[in-house]
């Protein structure tokens, strides 16, 4: 085996020993160093959801970055993906793989540096290839999903790690931690980039129904300004089950994309509201709860009442269709991804109100057949415009449709049309323009 320990292989062949940081790997007597102090996963939300994309390794004092390289560490993780795999795979030692390390540098906080260059500090940041299959944080729990509270990330320090020398540039400094084949597990909660910036609260309707929700205000939020708001309506499994609060932000990209110009292609400030309905009662009843929350929220924050938008994933479309039909004029535009079908009555109501809608769907969606859902919704709304006397050109401006071939999905979940949809900034800019 190479100097760089293959952690996934070691776990299967000999059973990797897992230890608590600070209990081993200390330097020799008189050599300084107290070993690894903490392991802190760092997560990001990508097109197909949240995953570990870096690890912060904390030492007792400032680390000498000149002694570090990508072979200094091995990071492995579970290959489990809630979209495809049984939940038992999470802890199966045969269902693990080493991650690809893309950068190693020091920092004074457990955070990423955009330039991937070292700053003086006691944290070593180990960045990982986000396209690796391992490191997903969301897990199934019955018919729902939640963020896994016990991430399976493991770190091995393959080479000695040294402190800064007493005189800069002279030697490598005292040893902080000796090389070892022992694996470290996370010792502190993950740092969840962007997801941790949301505020997570609960709202109770006038009829006593409780709904958790998350929201994000733009940096430098100014109550004297008016901001567009995008309401994220998540899939069935992201509904609230009593113990999975906040997963509607982590499971898919829509909630966090609006804070990132690399996704939207615009620097415009946007408020995001992400309700997490309990999956009880009809879609219409759930929509009523969501609308009461939205109206209350819009009254408390500086929302542009002419720029309220809905963006849905899968089952969230049923709430959007119901709200668009029942509360005409509430939403100024809607983006329906991988959704259920709008009924004929809903299509007529939507066309009557003239609310612009863009529908996207995967050609080979394995859960919702495209011909009876995405295509049907588009055709019903378009035909309703024809019945109301609109020209084809006018209808084409008010209802749009995009269908994605398999090649548009970098993970083989053709149901999650939100992934390729949100990778197309022109669609997001269209929504904000309504």
Predicted regions span which residues?
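Gly/Ser-rich "nucleophile elbow"/oxyanion-hole loop immediately N-terminal to the catalytic nucleophile
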Residues: 220-225, 281-314
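Primarily recognizes the serine-hydrolase "nucleophile elbow" in alpha/beta-hydrolase
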Residues: 299-300, 306-351
């Amino acid at each position: 085996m190479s100097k760089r320990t293959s952690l996934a292989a070691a776990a299967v062949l000999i059973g990797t020993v897992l230890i608590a940081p600070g209990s081993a790997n200390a330097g020799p007597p008189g050599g300084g160093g107290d070993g690894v102090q903490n392991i802190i996963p760092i997560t990001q939300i990508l097109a197909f959801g949240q995953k570990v994309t870096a690890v912060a390794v904390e030492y007792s004092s400032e680390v000498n970055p000149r002694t570090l390289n990508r072979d200094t560490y091995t990071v492995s993780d579970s290959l489990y993906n809630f979209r495809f795999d049984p939940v038992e795979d999470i802890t199966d030692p045969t269902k693990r793989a080493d991650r690809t390390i893309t950068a190693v540098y020091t920092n004074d906080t457990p955070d990423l540096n955009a330039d991937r260059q070292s700053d003086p500090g006691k944290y070593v940041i180990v960045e990982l290839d986000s396209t690796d299959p391992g490191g997903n944080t969301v897990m199934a729990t019955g018919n729902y999903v939640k963020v896994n509270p016990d991430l399976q990330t493991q770190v091995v320090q393959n080479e000695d790690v040294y402190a800064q020398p007493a005189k800069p540039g002279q030697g490598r400094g005292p040893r902080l931690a000796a090389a070892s084949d022992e694996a470290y597990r996370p010792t502190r909660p993950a740092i969840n980039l962007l997801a941790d910036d949301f505020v997570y609260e609960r709202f109770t309707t006038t009829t006593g129904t409780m709904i958790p929700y998350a929201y994000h205000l733009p940096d430098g939020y100014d109550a004297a300004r008016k901001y567009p708001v995008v309401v994220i309506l998540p899939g069935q499994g992201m509904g609230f089950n009593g113990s999975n609060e906040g997963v509607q932000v982590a499971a898919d990209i829509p909630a966090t994309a609006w804070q990132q110009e690399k996704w939207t292609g615009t620097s415009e400030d946007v408020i995001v509201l992400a309700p997490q309905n309990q999956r009880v009662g009809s879609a219409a009843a759930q929509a009523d709860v969501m609308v009461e929350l939205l109206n209350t929220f819009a009254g408390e924050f500086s929302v542009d009442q002419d720029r309220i938008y809905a963006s849905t994933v899968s089952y969230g479309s049923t709430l959007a269709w119901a709200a668009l039909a029942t509360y005409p004029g509430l939403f100024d535009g809607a983006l329906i991804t991988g959704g259920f079908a709008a009924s004929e009555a809903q299509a007529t109501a939507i066309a009557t109100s003239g609310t612009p809608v863009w529908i996207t769907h995967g050609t080979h969606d394995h859960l919702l057949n495209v011909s009876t859902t995405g295509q049907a919704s588009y055709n019903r709304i378009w035909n309703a415009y024809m019945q109301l006397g609109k020209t084809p050109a006018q209808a084409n401006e008010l209802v749009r449709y995009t269908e994605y071939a398999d090649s548009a999905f970098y993970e083989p979940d053709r149901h999650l049309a939100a992934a390729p949809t949100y990778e197309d900034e022109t669609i997001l800019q269209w929504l904000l323009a309504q």
